A protein has these predicted regions:
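Catalytic centers of hydrolytic enzymes
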Residues: 1-272
Length: 272
């Protein structure tokens, strides 16, 4: 067990300045959150955590629609002072921010693929809402998704429902744009998403939207020079104090099924 080993005094002394520099950097205050935010609610509906990312992406790009997913399975940032260290919980990967051209039909196909990996097809009110692995014998305390949660993209900029009783291809109904304008499957929209997704990660653009892998590059209108976390830090510094709230632009239906199923699945996943 490495924890029980005595550290080398010579080593600790030699690298003390670097250790202090890193520690000072990650401890630097960025701003203040008046509300705590967590990824847990993001699996069951709109959440302040993911919608903060959506809002930032839309503001930075001027896009019509934003796609984003919970990059950490179970992350939380407590209200109060926010540090650089917290920003790695909020956004753990070094992704750039892309703006891409997608048609309305491709946006729907993208979301169909995402929610098919994320949600179960409920046949009764007692079924799981989420697509979860059943617990194995001897691993009763361990629960997980069938698929990686960092591929569970939701959208902002559009108002839509997810019918969890329907099969893939029929789950998503996009009602309108968030500003009230009609949503048109034949129209081309500007979409903000991270570079992992924009390069085909998770197959949401290829398998879901139906765009060939070799066509993705030509769909990119713009890419940021720096990673998304950098822009988040600058954004929070500029605002000073933020009160992250859900945008409430989508919901899982039928709600008389999903509400109770969400409570059950939250306990199944997180034990509380």
């Amino acid at each position: 067990d490495v924890d029980k080993l005595e550290p080398s005094e010579e080593f600790m002394e030699k690298f003390a300045p670097q250790y202090k520099a890193v520690n000072d950097f990650v401890s630097e205050k960025v701003g203040t959150f008046t509300e705590s935010i967590a990824t847990r609610p993001a699996y069951f509906g709109p959440s302040a955590f993911i919608d903060f990312i959506h809002s930032l992406q839309l503001e930075l790009t001027g896009a019509d629609v934003s796609f984003a997913a919970p990059l950490s399975f179970d992350a939380k940032i407590d209200k109060g002072d926010i540090t650089i260290s917290d920003m790695f919980s909020l956004y753990k990967y070094e992704n750039m921010l892309y703006t891409m051209n997608l048609t309305g039909a491709e946006i729907k196909g993208f979301l169909e693929e995402s929610y098919a990996m994320w949600t179960n097809r409920m046949k009764s009110p007692d079924d799981h809402l989420l697509l979860l692995k059943e617990r194995k014998k001897g691993q009763e305390n361990y629960a997980s998704f069938v698929n990686f949660s960092f591929n569970f993209d939701s959208a902002a900029g559009i108002i839509y429902t997810v019918d969890v009783t329907k099969p893939k291809g029929e789950k998503i109904t996009i009602l309108k744009m968030a500003d009230g304008k009609p949503f048109d499957e034949n129209k081309t929209y500007k979409v903000a998403l991270n570079s992992y997704r924009g390069n085909g990660g998770g197959e949401l653009l290829t398998k879901g939207a139906g765009i060939p892998q070799d066509e993705l590059k030509s769909r990119i209108i713009h890419s940021t020079d720096k990673d998304l976390r950098y822009y988040m830090i600058q954004y929070i510094k500029e605002k000073g104090v933020l009160s992250p709230q859900p945008l409430n632009q989508w919901q899982m239906i039928p709600q008389d099924w999903t509400r109770l199923a969400a409570e059950r699945d939250c306990k199944f996943l997180f034990g509380e």
